[in-house]
Amino acid sequence: MQLQGPVFVGVPLLGPILICMLIHQPSSRCEDERKLPWCPPHKVILLVWVTIYSVMGYASYLVWKELGGGFRWPLALPLGLYSFQLALSWTFLVLFLAADSPGLALLDLLLLYGLVASLVFIWQPINKLAALLLLPYLAWLTVTTAITYRLWRDSLCPTYQP
């Protein structure tokens, strides 16, 4: 892996690190007595997100490298969509952890799910491994969407319900 590889792996981690530094009092809705029994513990959630962000960063590096690197036109769609989904992923963290807005977080997740699924199809002809590395991300988004939906539906956080 060239010097750019660690940069591609590290950039996705910057958003959550900054968000955690800026959020002084994260939401405690998943820690009270009404917590979903099938919701993973916070440490597991944190570990999964860190792993997912690192793996998707490596996958984006594979696509970038396969298309010749640099900032050329063939990279615009595959890495442009990747950048947009990364921003949506960071937005979800803000909506879910800081804004106590499960309705908006759910809408964000649905858009994010569609973007990641699109990335799998767009990246597959470029680099099959990169596309396959996004599949655990889709699986985790499914779990996260189910948790967020239940929190919204069961009115654990009644504010901002659509």
Swiss-Prot record:
Deletion consequences: Decreases erythrocyte count and increases reticulocyte count. Abnormal erythroblast cytokinesis and differentiation. Decreases hemoglobin levels in maturing erythroid cells.
Molecular functions per Gene Ontology: 5-aminolevulinic acid transmembrane transporter activity; cholesterol binding
Intracellular or extracellular location(s): Endoplasmic reticulum membrane; Cell membrane
GO process terms (BP): 5-aminolevulinic acid import across plasma membrane; enucleate erythrocyte differentiation; import across plasma membrane; intracellular cholesterol transport; lipid droplet organization
A GO-annotated cellular component: endoplasmic reticulum membrane
Expression across tissues: Expressed in liver, bone marrow and spleen. In spleen, detected in red pulp but not in white pulp.
Residue stretches spanning the membrane: 3-23, 44-64, 79-99, 103-123, 129-149
Keywords: Cell membrane, Endoplasmic reticulum, Membrane, Receptor, Transmembrane, Transmembrane helix, Transport
Membrane topology value: Multi-pass membrane protein
Keyword Iron-sulfur (UniProt): no
Family of this protein: Belongs to the TspO/BZRP family.
Assembly behavior: Homotetramer. May also form homodimer.
Role this protein plays: Cholesterol-binding protein involved in the redistribution of cholesterol from lipid droplets to the endoplasmic reticulum. Required to meet cholesterol demands during erythropoietic differentiation. May play a role in transport processes at the plasma membrane of erythrocytes, including regulating VDAC-mediated ATP export, and import of the heme precursors protoporphyrin IX and 5-aminolevulinic acid.
Record remark on domains: The C-terminal region mediates cholesterol-binding.
Name of protein: Translocator protein 2
Protein's organism: Mus musculus (Mouse)
